[in-house]
């Protein structure tokens, strides 16, 4: 009877150790993500290119690293933005900037040369698209506001690394297969 309790207690300890290790891995990943978010000043410091609208600069599945500490976006800079009301990041290039004066976007000709107003309003376009992004913006929105809509500016990338997340979102059955394989690995590792 004592040997039964001893083996049962050791398997319980082993199970608890595995649960704690798993919790440690999850909390470490979460802390790294939040730390990176604070460091880059971006709610999403790493994003995946979901379409071919920025080809040839970025391909579908490229992993982008963002930085959001610049007070303004420059002409030609590649930015990631979210459309108001939707949570899908869009990666496009800034093709026009407009200074904001008295709460309204003014055309560059309307601002005198001596004005030091930073450009806050942006117009974007995908490199592979014919037209600008005004059709993608929220209803009654003609420009992106730098502080409100921009998630970050692209500072680096890794080609094709993000394709795994695209595959998992496009093929839900693949998630089930991967979870099954991971569960099987845990069971097989326990038996050793």
Swiss-Prot record:
It is a single-pass type II membrane protein. Disulfide bonds: none annotated. Residues 1-18 are cytoplasmic. SUPFAM superfamilies: LexA/Signal peptidase. One of its GO terms (molecular function) is serine-type endopeptidase activity. Residues 40-192 are lumenal. It is an enzyme of class 3 (hydrolase). Residues 177-188 are annotated as: C-terminal short (CTS) helix. The keyword Hydrolase applies. Keywords: Endoplasmic reticulum, Hydrolase, Membrane, Protease, Signal-anchor, Transmembrane, Transmembrane helix. It catalyses: Cleavage of hydrophobic, N-terminal signal or leader sequences from secreted and periplasmic proteins. The active site is at residues 53, 92, 133. PROSITE patterns: SPASE_I_1 (PS00501). It comes from the Eukaryota. It is found in: Endoplasmic reticulum membrane. Its main location: endoplasmic reticulum. Its EC number is 3.4.21.89. The chain crosses the membrane at residues 19-39. The keyword Endoplasmic reticulum applies. GO terms for biological process: protein targeting to ER; signal peptide processing. The C-terminal short (CTS) helix is essential for catalytic activity. It may be accommodated as a transmembrane helix in the thinned membrane environment of the complex, similarly to the signal peptide in the complex substrates. Belongs to the peptidase S26B family. This is Signal peptidase complex catalytic subunit sec11.
């Amino acid at each position: 009877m004592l040997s039964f309790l001893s083996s049962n207690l050791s398997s319980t300890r082993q199970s608890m150790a595995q649960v704690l290790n798993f919790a440690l891995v999850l909390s470490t990943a979460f802390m790294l993500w939040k730390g990176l978010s604070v460091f880059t000043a971006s709610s999403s410091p790493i994003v995946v290119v979901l379409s071919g609208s920025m080809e040839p600069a970025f391909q579908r599945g490229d992993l982008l690293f963002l930085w959001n500490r610049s007070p303004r976006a420059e002409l030609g800079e590649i930015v990631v933005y979210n459309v108001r009301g939707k949570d899908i990041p869009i990666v496009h290039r800034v093709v026009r900037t407009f200074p904001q004066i008295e709460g309204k976007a003014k055309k560059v000709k309307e601002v005198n040369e001596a004005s030091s107003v930073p450009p806050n309003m942006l117009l974007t376009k995908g490199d592979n698209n014919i037209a600008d992004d005004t059709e993608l913006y929220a209803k009654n929105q003609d420009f992106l506001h730098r502080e409100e809509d921009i998630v970050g500016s692209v500072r680096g990338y890794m080609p094709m690394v993000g394709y795994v997340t695209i595959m998992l979102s496009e093929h839900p059955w693949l998630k089930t297969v991967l979870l099954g394989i991971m569960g099987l690995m845990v069971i097989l590792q326990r038996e050793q």
